[in-house]
Amino acid sequence: MSDRIDRDVINALIAGHFADPFSVLGMHKTTAGLEVRALLPDATDVWVIEPKTGRKLAKLECLDSRGFFSGVIPRRKNFFRYQLAVVWHGQQNLIDDPYRFGPLIQEMDAWLLSEGTHLRPYETLGAHADTMDGVTGTRFSVWAPNARRVSVVGQFNYWDGRRHPMRLRKESGIWELFIPGAHNGQLYKYEMIDANGNLRLKSDPYAFEAQMRPETASLICGLPEKVVQTEERKKANQFDAPISIYEVHLGSWRRHTDNNFWLSYRELADQLVPYAKWMGFTHLELLPINEHPFDGSWGYQPTGLYAPTRRFGTRDDFRYFIDAAHAAGLNVILDWVPGHFPTDDFALAEFDGTNLYEHSDPREGYHQDWNTLIYNYGRREVSNFLVGNALYWIERFGIDALRVDAVASMIYRDYSRKEGEWIPNEFGGRENLEAIEFLRNTNRILGEQVSGAVTMAEESTDFPGVSRPQDMGGLGFWYKWNLGWMHDTLDYMKLDPIYRQYHHDKLTFGMLYNNTENFVLPLSHDEVVHGKKSILDRMPGDAWQKFANLRAYYGWMWAFPGKKLLFMGNEFAQGREWNHDASLDWHLLEGGDNWHHGVQRLVRDLNLTYRHHKAMHELDFDPYGFEWLVVDDKERSVLIFVRRDKEGNEIIVASNFTPVPRHDYRFGINQPGKWREILNTDSMHYHGSNAGNGGTVHSDEIASHGRQHSLSLTLPPLATIWLVREAE
């Protein structure tokens, strides 16, 4: 008889409490010879089969009626390839034994994963189609170092955790198993007995696709092919490029009118992409599309960082959408959320029964504002999971930029916390040093591995050097959202024009710090929710004045140094706040030509004009690219400045933020000659009053504002005009 398997071991295996199934199951050399053991619940008969001939080599004895079989193979001494013929419910099935295969993860991969320096952990962890010893199937790997047992359960094994317990690689805390026959399209999860002895079902942190909510299973889905970065896409992200971003929530941009259901990724490719291109935008920014359980989070509480949400279609459908955007000349920015994750039990929270991905102390690991958990960036495997995710979206989907959400909440330990609710760092400070290092490391790796892709930070404080290189002490982002500019200018615009003279500095203050960062000027989704009103509705006055104010503001914004970002609906002056459960108010553009059409035409013309003239974008972050001509006329709420390109070509921008037209308004200029009006937000084309300067105006050799030559203009009411100097 063979080496006897202890009854306690059999009981533990069947109960799912045995942590080392490979030490028992599969083929083993024993004193009696070569022995095969299998755990096959509900099986009645099991034979060992010679694959080449189909010959039955031995029948396994049922040692436990719950499905434990064992038997010695006669006349065999060395390990060989075999299959099992298993009879279930009177039907014979030929299967490959998962427990005859050796370790899956290579030593170098295991070492890099443990060190947290594996550039692409998603190529090893998760579910991957594979062929081993001529057998096709799927290899599964999951990091859960404190679990007592982990099994793969899914459609291929009746969701029975007894059937496929995994091998623990103790050196890395990773559990692994190759399951023959498991294939793309099948659902799976990890069933584990956690560190506390509780039975848990967990989705795969590295799942590349997932079920549609409210279901939570992962989907076997191979890695997508890498997307080549083109020189055109790289160039479109550069500091001197025109960048005008259309920020979109895919679930509410437009919906089916008959049932209010979302458009699919492919429908969005056919509708959203050509619309954004026609409007003249250069980039699409998508609110998070990572899988998330709660629609009301807008994607900012993700549970599946590696899986595009199934709300709008499959992973391949999302790839189709990205490809369509690129074909239309649009770069794609993805909102990325490495700052926190939800508490849902099926996901990362207490993954193996311990605080594996999060901090154990709620003063470090819990966001009371959002009821979410904070990643433990100091744990190597966690930061590796996140850095790898950033690279994954860029390499495997062709994402051109990542906009990192809520950076301030990551880099400050006392973010939104009272005294006593946070733990200082090792030096007694408030900075989260591990998060800062994580962000720097992410930006460094992206710069090295996918040069041309960029990152943008939503950072709401004055933390120094967010968009400065790391060798200068910065975080290494390419761009930073200028939330201060946004708040100041919106606070100014909501004032009745009669009071604006007392708040003139709200429009000028931004230039005092403009060159400290590489700024994006954002009118984002955050400004049209939670009772803040729409941008249009914040403007003072009657309907005519509201639209005129908005047009003047857009003209100012597109001319001011910094890249542009506009949330969907603002391009046609939607009057309501954004509702993530409904379509934008496209009906405002139905019927006859109206004020909303005027704003839409203006935004399109702003984009096209801004892109055409290098002076409006080439030197956004160089002091030479901007100069005030009139900065102190607060009594009349007039501001005039010059934008300049590398060759010295200038565009004059003049704004009048009162409803009083200013006739014969004289100001000094640098370059005498004939100036042509290339944009006037008061144009009749945009439903303005059509005041202006008749197309062109000549300078006079009359000194003004310390300059020898000057222009005398009509400044339309509540309007911004752009003028370019005609060639001699």
Curated annotation (Swiss-Prot):
Provide this UniProt record's keywords sorted from A to Z: Carbohydrate metabolism, Glycogen biosynthesis, Glycogen metabolism, Glycosyltransferase, Transferase
Xref: CDD domains? AmyAc_Glg_BE, E_set_GBE_prok_N
Q: Can you state which reaction this protein catalyses?
A: Transfers a segment of a (1->4)-alpha-D-glucan chain to a primary hydroxy group in a similar glucan chain
Per the record, its GO cellular-component terms are: cytosol
Its Enzyme Commission number? 2.4.1.18
Q: In which pathway does it act?
A: Glycan biosynthesis; glycogen biosynthesis
Q: Which Pfam families match?
A: Alpha-amylase, Alpha-amylase_C, CBM_48, GlgB_N
SUPFAM superfamilies xref list: (Trans)glycosidases, E set domains, Glycosyl hydrolase domain
Q: What does this protein do?
A: Catalyzes the formation of the alpha-1,6-glucosidic linkages in glycogen by scission of a 1,4-alpha-linked oligosaccharide from growing alpha-1,4-glucan chains and the subsequent attachment of the oligosaccharide to the alpha-1,6 position.
Which NCBIfam families does this chain map to? Answer: branching_enzym, PRK05402.1, PRK12313.1
Q: How does it assemble?
A: Monomer.
What this protein is called in its record is 1,4-alpha-glucan branching enzyme GlgB
Supply the source organism for this entry.
Answer: Shigella dysenteriae serotype 1 (strain Sd197)
